[in-house]
Amino acid sequence: MTPLMIRIRQEHRGIAEEVTQLFKDTQEFLSVTTAQRQAQAKEQAENLHQFHKDLEKDTEEFLTDTAKERMAKAKQQAEDLFQFHKEMAENTQEFLSETAKERMAQAQEQARQLREFHQNLEQTTNEFLADTAKERMAQAQEQKQQLHQFRQDLFASIFGTF
């Protein structure tokens, strides 16, 4: 064989060895990369699963806390409303009681004023009637006196003087 052939064979072997080595290196790289990616995917899946569990737990806690807060707030509002209703009823009762007392006092005052007015009217009427009776009595006495004088004068003029 000629040295050129030997050399071509050696180069061919060298290229084949390099291709084989390159193939091995590529396979090893792909194998390592695949293993890394699978490990990374597994880790991401675990992280995602843990995140999902944590999110569910946090959501459940949040909803529970929110429900407790709302229940406490509703109870407080119910208590406040009950207290307001109670105070309103007491205030209304006090108002009605005070109003009834005021109206009773006004009615008593009006009754007193009406009695006083009636008494004054009765007294004034009695005084008026008494004064009128006195005046009429005085007029009647005067008219009687005048009539008596007229009769005497008439008698004297008819029969003469005695």
Swiss-Prot record:
Intervals holding Sequence repeats: 19-51, 52-84, 85-117, 118-150
Entry GO CC: gas vesicle
Induction: Gas vesicle formation in this filamentous organism is restricted to specialized filaments called hormogonia which differentiate at the tapering ends of trichomes. Transcribed during hormogonia differentiation in red light. Probably part of a gvpA1-gvpA2-gvpC operon. Transcription is maximal after 6 hours, degradation of the larger transcripts (with gvpC) occurs rapidly between 9 and 12 hours or upon a shift to green light. All transcripts disappear between 12 and 24 hours.
Matching Pfam families: Gas_vesicle_C (PF01304)
GO biological process: gas vesicle organization
Predominant location category: other
The UniProt record lists the keyword Zinc: no
Keywords assigned: Gas vesicle, Repeat
Annotated compartments: Gas vesicle
Region annotation 4 X 33 AA tandem repeats: where it falls in the sequence: 19-150
Top-rank taxon: Bacteria
Role, per record: Confers stability, involved in shaping gas vesicles, hollow, gas filled proteinaceous nanostructures. During planktonic growth they allow positioning of the organism at a favorable depth for light or nutrient acquisition.
Recorded family membership: Belongs to the gas vesicle GvpC family.
Protein name from the UniProt record: Gas vesicle protein C
Species in which this protein is naturally found: Microchaete diplosiphon (Fremyella diplosiphon)
Gene name, Swiss-Prot/TrEMBL: gvpC
